[in-house]
Amino acid sequence: MKLPRSSLVWCVLIVCLTLLIFTYLTRKSLCEIRYRDGYREVAAFMAYESGK
């Protein structure tokens, strides 16, 4: 089954938006995401500055 290119773009866009909305609803910030298990912790931070 081969999707047309425009359908593929829409599918990827919908998946990305769904992940962003889910992350926003379950976390207090989109700028910090942490994952912890028994032995490891992975943290991703987004740093940004205003261009003013």
UniProtKB/Swiss-Prot annotation:
Pfam families documented for this protein: HOK_GEF
Principal subcellular localization: membrane
Induction context: Part of the flmC-flmA operon; the antisense antitoxin RNA flmB of this system overlaps the ribosome-binding site and first 3 codons of flmC on the opposite strand.
Localization annotation: Cell inner membrane
Coiled-coil residue spans: none
GO CC list: plasma membrane
Membrane topology value: Single-pass membrane protein
InterPro entries referenced in this protein's UniProt entry, alphabetically: Hok/gef_toxin, Hok/gef_toxin_CS
Transmembrane regions listed in the UniProt entry: 6-26
Keywords recorded for this protein, A-Z: Cell inner membrane, Cell membrane, Membrane, Plasmid, Toxin-antitoxin system, Transmembrane, Transmembrane helix
Family classification: Belongs to the Hok/Gef family.
Function: Toxic component of a type I toxin-antitoxin (TA) system. Part of the plasmid maintenance system, encodes a toxic protein that collapses the transmembrane potential and arrests respiration. When the adjacent non-translated flmB (sok) gene is disrupted FlmA no longer functions in plasmid maintenance (i.e. FlmB probably encodes an antisense antitoxin RNA). The flmA and flmB RNAs interact, and presence of flmB on a separate plasmid from one encoding flmA and flmB allows loss of the latter plasmid. Translation of FlmA may be coupled to the upstream flmC gene.
The protein's name: Stable plasmid inheritance protein
Organism name: Escherichia coli (strain K12)
